[in-house]
Amino acid sequence: MKRNNNLIIPLLKIKKLLKRKGCKRIQNSALVFFSKVLQYLIEELLEISMNVSILNKTKKYRIKPKDISWSIQSDPEFNLLFRNIIIPSSGRISNKLNRIIQRSFKFKSFKFDDYEKSDYSSKTF
């Protein structure tokens, strides 16, 4: 496998995890693509979480589990992706705080039940 300096997540670790889950043969290009997608998702989540932590009254540059949970719940795409995930020591998000976060990021409120009932593929969030 070639060494790629732009990747944060090691390719061999991804390959071992996928093999443990049942993938017998994996192309190296698929591993690089998978690593890039994971890296992009992590960067986006950390960026939104940092903005949420700055928006709080403390205005500190430390991301807490609660900030990650708030950013997941305020973003419709992350909310859909992580709908069954529980983040330890993140607490519950209040509706008032959720509205403040959504207004500051200009997100549209989103419910997964609405997504199942109709086709949102042509609409933007």
From Swiss-Prot:
GO terms for cellular component: nucleosome; nucleus. Signal peptide: none annotated. Keywords: Chromosome, DNA-binding, Nucleosome core, Nucleus. InterPro entries: Histone-fold, Histone_H2A, Histone_H2A/H2B/H3. Pfam families: Histone. Its main location: nucleus. SUPFAM superfamilies: Histone-fold. One of its GO terms (biological process) is cell motility. It is found in: Nucleus; Chromosome. One of its GO terms (molecular function) is protein heterodimerization activity. The keyword rRNA processing does not apply. Core component of nucleosome which plays a central role in DNA double strand break (DSB) repair. Nucleosomes wrap and compact DNA into chromatin, limiting DNA accessibility to the cellular machineries which require DNA as a template. Histones thereby play a central role in transcription regulation, DNA repair, DNA replication and chromosomal stability. DNA accessibility is regulated via a complex set of post-translational modifications of histones, also called histone code, and nucleosome remodeling. The nucleosome is a histone octamer containing two molecules each of H2A, H2B, H3 and H4 assembled in one H3-H4 heterotetramer and two H2A-H2B heterodimers. The octamer wraps approximately 147 bp of DNA. Belongs to the histone H2A family. This is Histone H2A.v3.
